Structures are given as structure tokens and as C-alpha cells.
UniProtKB/Swiss-Prot annotation:
Positions of the UniProt region annotated as Disordered: 1-23
Entry function: Methyltransferase required for the conversion of demethylmenaquinol (DMKH2) to menaquinol (MKH2) and the conversion of 2-polyprenyl-6-methoxy-1,4-benzoquinol (DDMQH2) to 2-polyprenyl-3-methyl-6-methoxy-1,4-benzoquinol (DMQH2).
This protein's UniProt keywords: Menaquinone biosynthesis, Methyltransferase, S-adenosyl-L-methionine, Transferase, Ubiquinone biosynthesis
Gene Ontology terms, MF aspect: 2-methoxy-6-polyprenyl-1,4-benzoquinol methyltransferase activity; demethylmenaquinone methyltransferase activity
Protein name listed in UniProt: Ubiquinone/menaquinone biosynthesis C-methyltransferase UbiE
Similarity remark: Belongs to the class I-like SAM-binding methyltransferase superfamily. MenG/UbiE family.
Residue stretches of biased makeup (Basic and acidic residues): 1-12
Known pathway: Quinol/quinone metabolism; menaquinone biosynthesis; menaquinol from 1,4-dihydroxy-2-naphthoate: step 2/2; Cofactor biosynthesis; ubiquinone biosynthesis
InterPro entries, sorted: SAM-dependent_MTases_sf, UbiE/COQ5_MeTrFase, UbiE/COQ5_MeTrFase_CS
Catalytic activity field: a 2-demethylmenaquinol + S-adenosyl-L-methionine = a menaquinol + S-adenosyl-L-homocysteine + H(+); a 2-methoxy-6-(all-trans-polyprenyl)benzene-1,4-diol + S-adenosyl-L-methionine = a 5-methoxy-2-methyl-3-(all-trans-polyprenyl)benzene-1,4-diol + S-adenosyl-L-homocysteine + H(+)
Protein's organism: Pseudomonas putida (strain GB-1)
EC id: 2.1.1.163, 2.1.1.201
Binding positions (S-adenosyl-L-methionine): 79, 100, 128-129
A Pfam family hit: Ubie_methyltran
Length: 256
């Protein structure tokens, strides 16, 4: 556990990047980051990943097994990359719910998908991953891409995702993870703490938000730890696939 107590009555703390902050403040601080970067979020994704994020998301969709008529929940769906693709897969008899806790990101996603004409079977919901406002056993598939590391209580969020899935439903977590070799790890550290804040400054005039994002990646559970968290929450057949030498991993679990 990342939480620390400084006294019997002190508020628990958690990490915000490399800082320890009161739990009640983390969501506010994360919200400020995404309010700041929402307008140019897609551009920054392309710049920072060299377009690789599109391949990572495509592989996640292939693993999802989503088909016509399914009901899909995309948590931290932001600007709608996954939701747009799921919309086409589920077709007119299916439904996609794009959920995000951040209203700025949700607005960008809604506007973008409406402009593209692909929002007919997509519902937009402002929601907290830890307390999903949906019925039990409701979705065939739940996804969260590059969002779990920003959640304060990750274990609660994973249990919430389990609750809203139908038996046999799939959870897919796409997230930055731990590189699998030392050379890649050193290169990735240099890239993250030098280039990412610089690009953030040049493109969004916000170096600090991208410094936080780099730090948040380092504080996120590694591949095996996240797998164990999913098993502990109640998922079966939990597996993960490393991509780009473990810089990114996608975890998949099935609700019994």
C-alpha cells in the first residue's frame, strides 16, 4: 500500500507523482492536470509515443473480443479513441459508454466523436472509476486505457469494474508499465524526464503536467503486481502482454 498515516487521526496520504499528498487532494490535482492538457491531449499522445499509442490500442481492441450487440464501458475514455472503434464493432444493436471523471476530457471526447459522426450508439457519462454508477452484471467488456495510474484507490476501482461486468465479461487495462530490460529502462527514463516535460512546455505551455505524468508512470504497479491485484479482486484467467519492451502492458481478466 502507498498510503501512510502520520498519526491516529491524520488523513491517509497517497502519491501524486513523487509527492505524498492527502488522499482527498489527489483527485483534485489529477483533475487540474487533465483540465490543462485536454485540448491538445491527442496531439501530445502522437508526439510522445510517435504514434505507437494507436497500435497499443488496436491490440487491446483485438484482445477484447467485442462483437455486434455487446455493451462496452470505456473508463477514462477521454477523447474517445477506443469508444469510436468499439462503436463500430458493437453496431446499432450494441452500446458503448464513454466514462471519464474529468469534464474537460469528456467534453473534448463528445465534441470530437459528434464531429466524426460516430456517436449514435455512444453514451457519455461523468463517473468515478472507484464508484461506477452502473448496475451489477451490466457490461460485456470494460476497458481503461492509460487511466488506472491516476486513480487514488486502484483496488477499489478494479472491484468496481468487476461488479459491473456480466459473468464471463472481460476487463482490459492498458497502461504504462515497467520496461523489461535495463538498457530500455535507462533510455526511457531519460526520455520521460527530459523530453516529455519539454514537449509539454512547447505544445501545451505546461511542463509540470507532463512531469507529473512521467512520475505517475514510475509509481504505477508493475506487471506482476497489477496481475495480482486483479486476481485478488476476483478476476479469473488474468494474463498480460508486454508491448514495446514492457513500456506498455495490457492486462486481461475474466469475471467468473
Amino acid at each position: 500500500m502507498n498510503d501512510q498515516r502520520k498519526g491516529d487521526h491524520a488523513e491517509p496520504t497517497t502519491h501524486f507523482g513523487y509527492q505524498d499528498v492527502p488522499e482527498s487532494q489527489k483527485a483534485k490535482k489529477v483533475a487540474e492536470v487533465f483540465h490543462s492538457v485536454a485540448a491538445k491531449y491527442d496531439l501530445m499522445n502522437d508526439v510522445l509515443s510517435g504514434g505507437m499509442h494507436r497500435l497499443w490500442k488496436r491490440f487491446t481492441i483485438e484482445l477484447s473480443g467485442v462483437r455486434s450487440g455487446n455493451r462496452v464501458l470505456d473508463i477514462a475514455g477521454g477523447t474517445g479513441d477506443l469508444a469510436a472503434k468499439f462503436s463500430r464493432l458493437v453496431g446499432p444493436t450494441g452500446q458503448v459508454v464513454l466514462a471519464d471523471i474529468n469534464d474537460s476530457m469528456l467534453k473534448v471526447g463528445r465534441d470530437r466523436l459528434l464531429d466524426r459522426g460516430v456517436a449514435g450508439n455512444i453514451e457519455f457519462v461523468q463517473a468515478d472509476a472507484e464508484k461506477l454508477p452502473f448496475p451489477d452484471n451490466h457490461f460485456d467488456c470494460v476497458t481503461i486505457a492509460f487511466g488506472l495510474r491516476n486513480v487514488t484507490h486502484k483496488d477499489e476501482a478494479i472491484r468496481s469494474m468487476l461488479r459491473v461486468l456480466k459473468p464471463g465479461g472481460r476487463l482490459l487495462i492498458l497502461e504504462f508499465s515497467k520496461p523489461t530490460n535495463k538498457l530500455m529502462s535507462r533510455a526511457y527514463d531519460a526520455y520521460s524526464f527530459a523530453f516529455m516535460p519539454l514537449a509539454g512546455k512547447l505544445i501545451t505551455n505546461d511542463a509540470e503536467s507532463y512531469r507529473y505524468l512521467a512520475e505517475s508512470i514510475r509509481m504505477h504497479p508493475d506487471q506482476e503486481t497489477l496481475k495480482s491485484m486483479m486476481v485478488e479482486a476476483g478476476f479469473d484467467r488474468v494474463t498480460y502482454h508486454n508491448m514495446t519492451s514492457g513500456i506498455v502492458a495490457v492486462h486481461r481478466g475474466i469475471k467468473p
